[in-house]
Amino acid sequence: DAQGNLLHNENIYPHPPANQGKEAFAKLQKMIEAYKVEAIAIGNGTASRETEDFLKRHTFNREVQIFIVSEQGASIYSASKIARDEFPDYDVTVRGAVSIARRLMDPLAELVKIDPKPIGVGQYQHDVDQTKLKKSLDQTVENCGMSETTKGSVIKKRILAIFLRHYSANG
């Protein structure tokens, strides 16, 4: 929903080998109507372009925007304690999908849930100073701030921790 709550999840199989395009479209149409969907987030991984093409070939009963969103870190989040606490009744695939979708709404609030250490930075990942990485992330969160309406305690706790460290160091 508009606050990032998971109301429903369902799998569709529009691509080979299942090729259930008609069934997938019918399920999507039903969900778009029932939940007043305004946007669809597609993770930028496997079959993302095929999925985007599939969605754009169909006309839904209401206008729906389609976005391809970075999946980076979604698998890290989906297996984390934070994700298990947020969605204890769902498996990692559903948790990851929710994380990707929420990135459309409030990317900072969603990405701050991901521990930056395991996120690869290509062939140079072992050259990255983890202390500097955490400090840089904290500075980014601090510079961006947060909205009063930000849902979830993770970003609020992180900002509070930054504030307390600053207050302890500087009075």
What does each model-identified segment do?
Residues A2-Q3, N11-I12, G45, V69-A74, ...:
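Short, ordered loop/turn segments at secondary-structure junctions
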Residues G21-F25, S48-L55, I66, V94-M105, ...:
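Amphipathic alpha-helical transducer elements in NTP-driven molecular machines
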Residues N9-K22:
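Glycine-rich phosphate-binding "P-loop"
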Residues P16-A18, Q65-D106:
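Short alpha-helix plus adjacent loop in nuclease-associated cores
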Residues D1-L7, L104:
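Gly/Thr-rich phosphate-binding beta-strand-loop-beta motif of the actin/hexokinase/Hsp70
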Residues E23-E38, R57:
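Short, basic/hydrophobic alpha-helical segments
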Residues D85-G171:
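Long, highly charged, low-complexity intrinsically disordered interaction regions
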Residues K36-A47, I66-F67:
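Short glycine-rich phosphate-binding loop at a beta-alpha junction
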